[in-house]
Regions:
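Terminal, compositionally biased segments
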Residues: 36-42, 47-51, 55-57, 62-63, ...
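Intrinsically disordered terminal tails
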Residues: 24, 457-460
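Classical Sec-dependent N-terminal signal peptides that target proteins to the secretory pathway
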Residues: 1-44
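Leu/Val/Ala/Ile-rich N-terminal alpha-helices, chiefly Sec-type signal peptides and the beginnings
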Residues: 47-165, 169-176, 190, 250-268, ...
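Cytosolic/matrix-facing juxtamembrane and C-terminal tails of multi-pass cellular membrane proteins
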Residues: 66-82, 86, 90-91, 95, ...
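Interhelical loop segments of eukaryotic multi-pass membrane proteins
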Residues: 142-152, 202-209, 304-310, 344-348
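Membrane-active amphipathic alpha-helices enriched in small hydrophobic residues
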Residues: 114-140, 166-199, 273-301, 309-338, ...
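Extended amphipathic alpha-helical interaction segments
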Residues: 228-300, 312, 316-319, 325-329, ...
Length: 530
């Protein structure tokens, strides 16, 4: 009887024990493995592995036995917790996969967005610069020779004040209006594409509220599995050494769970902050181009109807457009941060009661588990070549690489996102270009409201604003080209290293699929042998 019980114990140990510390052979962090459903394991009636205490020596057989020693002492093995370990890890894989897919679905930029937006905004800046230069040449012609000589009807030489050619000034306004219309349409197109991607994400179950509910559900399932694991550990009557190993395993599992939840929160907040920032950029871009185009239409109407005072209201609209150019990058960033804070509040329940853990804490718990397993006197159940050990090594490598590459991923994402913006959507260039348009607006207001009947003075003042904004428009043209070249270079450089955001996330999903397959394979083998 004793030999049969001992043989059964060793057979089950060899089948189920997870060599959590065999990772010392591969030098990676430790992740406990999962896959067998608890209901298919211990809860389904499988007997725990036991070790029966040895019989008393023959010399002491005739001595009276105490009540506690009258029956053999049954102790469970830490290997009986393996089904729970695998099941918890399967849930953690599900959590990480959901977080990655959430980021992908809520942060779609597309390969050609940068080029589309560049073409629309470059057309805007180029057409505006061309129209302003055409106007500036005509205004300067009048400034250079303010009075022209002519012969009156009596043949006497006389002089008269020269006036700018209204047809030429109007012709200079037309490309500006067309450019601003193209710019607004380009921003509207990108905004519409964002709305479409948002619709797709919500339809796939990755909207903000459904996503939070899904993550909370996964968290609850993991917590339930932890509770079942703790109950099984207590019922197994583990030895002191095995109980310490079980607690160390649980610490590692909880480290990974905490890190997975924190990563989802980070992805959620980051994706929503950038989407709010980008959408507000497009909305403000539409606003500034629309206001500027209406201001130019007002000036064009004044030229056609010989009403120079229309330059005053037109200047007000031009001034407003310039202020919007200055404020767009600042207001968009503030709006993005405000949206991020709103989502952080709604995500507070995801991390409520969860101890903050990081890679450093995971490594500490791994090292402690390594020491405990190394101190075991019975190492016959540990096989570095077992399915569980290999899966565990894969999990550990994945977790280590994911955390080490997180900063790299964020940097790459920032570089790619920068390439989808126009020059004026950066604070420095936006302030400079917006300032030149504000100058044009002020000059137009002075010319229209104060010097409407003094054409030469009004023209001279208008010319100063025209030259200023033409300079700003050429700055926009040049910086847009710089940003496009920089974006293509970054994509080429990162793509060769497989560090583009979508490449990194795609590789992580493939790794998770391989891990999940390995876990389920281990579970299937265990079920067949049982």
């Amino acid at each position: 009887m004793e030999m049969q019980a001992t043989g059964l114990s060793k057979a089950i140990d060899k089948l189920l024990f997870v060599p959590l510390l065999s990772l010392a052979l591969v030098g990676s962090s430790v992740l406990p493995v999962a896959a067998l459903e608890p209901s298919a394991g211990l809860a389904a009636g499988a007997e725990p592995a036991v070790a029966i205490a040895e019989e008393p020596p023959a010399a002491a057989a005739s001595e009276p036995l105490s009540a506690s020693a009258a029956a053999p002492l049954l102790r469970g093995s830490v290997t009986s917790l393996e089904p729970f370990n695998r099941q918890i890890l399967l849930k953690e894989v599900e959590l990480e996969r959901f977080a990655i897919n959430f980021r992908k679905m809520n942060n779609v930029q597309g390969r050609w967005r940068g080029w589309r937006y560049f073409l629309s905004q470059e057309a805007n800046a180029g057409a505006t610069a061309g129209g302003l230069v055409y106007q500036a040449v005509e205004r300067q012609r009048v400034i250079n020779i303010a009075n022209e000589m002519f012969l009156d009807k009596n043949g006497k030489v006389s002089y008269r004040t020269r006036a700018a050619n209204r047809a030429k000034l109007g012709a200079g306004l037309v490309p500006q209006i067309v450019g601003q219309t193209i710019g607004a349409a380009g921003s509207g197109l990108e905004l519409g594409i964002n709305f479409y991607h948002e619709y797709q994400a919500r339809k796939a179950g990755y909207g903000p509220k459904p996503s939070i509910a899904r993550v909370l559900s996964i968290r609850q399932e993991i917590e339930d599995l932890f509770a079942q694991r703790q109950a099984a550990a207590l019922a197994a009557n583990l030895s002191e050494a095995d109980l310490e190993i079980a607690k160390a395993e649980e610490a590692v599992l909880k480290d990974i769970t905490s890190m997975g939840l924190a990563e989802y929160v980070q992805f959620h907040v980051g994706a929503k902050r950038f989407r709010a920032f980008q959408d507000s950029l497009y909305v403000l871009d539409i606003a500034k181009n629309t206001v500027g185009a209406v201001g130019n239409l007002m000036n064009l109407k004044g030229l056609h109807e010989r009403r120079p005072h229309y330059a005053g209201p037109g200047g007000v609209l031009t001034l407003t457009s310039g202020i919007l150019i200055i404020g767009t990058p600042i207001l968009s960033r503030l709006y993005g941060k405000a949206v991020a804070r709103m989502h952080e509040k709604s995500l507070a329940k995801v991390l409520d009661g969860v101890e903050k853990r990081d890679l450093h804490k995971l490594n500490e718990d791994r090292n402690r588990l390594l020491q405990l397993v190394a101190a075991r006197t019975d190492k016959s159940a540990i096989s570095p070549q077992s399915c569980s050990a290999q899966t565990l090594a894969l999990l550990s490598t994945y977790e280590q690489q994911s955390n080490l590459k997180q900063c790299q991923l964020e940097l790459a994402s920032r570089e790619i996102r920068d390439g989808t913006r126009a020059a004026t959507e950066n604070i420095t260039v936006g302030t400079a270009v917006g300032g030149t348009k504000v100058t044009l607006g002020i000059c137009s207001m002075i010319s229209g409201f104060r010097y409407a009947q003094q054409g030469h003075k009004g023209n001279s003042i208008f010319q100063a604003g025209t030259i200023a904004y033409a300079s700003g428009s050429f700055l926009t043209v040049g910086d847009n080209i710089r940003l496009r070249i920089k974006d293509e270079w970054n994509r080429h450089r990162l793509g060769k290293k497989r560090q583009l955001p979508m490449q990194v996330l795609g590789d992580r999903l493939k790794a998770l699929d391989a891990i999940e397959s390995s876990l389920k394979t281990c579970s299937g083998k265990s079920e067949k042998k049982e």
